[in-house]
Amino acid sequence: MNQTIKVKKKKKTITLGVVHIRASFNNTIVTFTDIQGNTISSASAGGNGFKGARKATPYAAQVTIDKASEKAKECGLKTISIRIGGPGAQRESAMRALFGQNFVVTSILDVSSIAHNGVRPPKRRRV
C-alpha cells in the first residue's frame, strides 16, 4: 500500500511591507508586497463583487482594502509603507480603511504620474 505523506508548507512571516493602491476612475486595485516587490496579497473592487460604476466608489475601496489586508495579516505583516497613485475619488477612503486595520504606517508616498503635455485628451462630449 502506498502511503502519501502530507507536508505542510511553512508560511513566510513578513513584518515589513509596501501597500500599492491604484485608484483609477473605474476601479481600485490594492497590492501588498514585501520590500523586494514580491506580492503577498492583492484585491480589486471588481474581484470583490462590485460591477460597473460601483467599482469606483469609496465603499468599494474600503471593502477591497479589508480583503487584501486580511490575507496580509495572515502572513504576519505589521509595518507598512503606503504608495498611492491614480486620479480616483476613492484614494482618501482607501487610506482611512488602512489606518483602521491597525498597521504601523511608516510613510505615505503619492506616485501618481503627471503628464507634461502628453497624450491628446478625448473630444468633448455632445449630448
Curated annotation (Swiss-Prot):
Keyword rRNA-binding on entry: yes
Cited HAMAP family: Ribosomal_uS11
Keywords: Ribonucleoprotein, Ribosomal protein, RNA-binding, rRNA-binding
Originating organism: Rickettsia prowazekii (strain Madrid E)
SUPFAM superfamilies named in the record: Translational machinery components
Organismal lineage: Bacteria, Pseudomonadati, Pseudomonadota, Alphaproteobacteria, Rickettsiales
Annotated family: Belongs to the universal ribosomal protein uS11 family.
Descriptive protein name: Small ribosomal subunit protein uS11
GO molecular function annotations of the record: rRNA binding; structural constituent of ribosome
